[in-house]
Amino acid sequence: MLERERELRLLNELKQAEIAQAVTRGLNPNVPMKECQTPMLGKIPVHWEERKMKYCFSERSEKNHPDEPILCATQSQGVIPQSMYANRVVVVNKGFDGLKLVKVGDFVISLRSFEGGIEYAYYQGIISAAYTILTPIDPSQSEYFKLLFKSYPFIQLLQTCVTGIREGQNINYSLLGRKYIPIPPSSEQKEIVTYINDKFAKVNSLITELEEEIAYLKEYKQRLIADAVTGKMKVC
């Protein structure tokens, strides 16, 4: 099992390194580079635009939609219905009216974004009022933003914008919104997204298989321990 976990970790590291390279430096290694106005993101192609985040998104704060399904923000699956994510139980203390509305295509900054990036909403529903909901002003850029917001350099940027000392930390969007992010030309955004999706289609399949195998091995190990403790299995 340890070997499988090592393989999984290596695959994820290689994937993330490739994504970080593509979303910040592009696909052409020969183009001239410039320093991004947000130093954490390193160098970007000279012809790429830079724009403050607050000019790329509007903030959604709609509430009072109690009939919408409750959503949760996951680092592996994006923003999905709570019913689809069995490993997490969301406790609502103040009723559904106080939860924020999320629409398909929004991006959600959660209390875990400082660890895993900003999540994309694949479903409409309602979510914790503590989260920041961002709607892209130009939806055609969403596919590129999905990659940028989950990249290591951007997560490092998020970690400079946190507030709070509890286990989950808020991202200060008034601070994050003033940070510059790279905006490649539309044609290059499409090329980057296609390149990453095509290159990692097989890798993603291998990652899923490894995750399932590791989960099975852990469950099998727990069953063996339980059988030994309860006397169902003889231990020599």
Where are each of the predicted segments found?
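Structural motif
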Residues: 103-106
